[in-house]
Amino acid sequence: MLYELGRLAPGSFDVFLDGVVVASLVRSGPHHGATWSAELLLDLDQKDRPPPFRRLEHQFATFEEACDWLGNPEIASEP
């Protein structure tokens, strides 16, 4: 799956799949020690979730870890 990130605000991204927003990626907490979460926007049955989503929400220690999990998506330039 090829994902793309669209920056909304510092620490907040839309996650696109085939041009459609399917999830959000957001930072929780201050920069130092912040965690990141990727959350599907629709409550899909597990069999219908796009890989690598096995749950509706996944937690990560760093932005880089989240990007690795998403297959190193391209970050779209800001409008």
Briefly describe each language-model feature range.
Residues 1-6, 37-79:
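Mixed-charge, Lys/Arg-enriched low-complexity segments
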Residues 1-44:
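Short N-terminal "domain-start" leader segments
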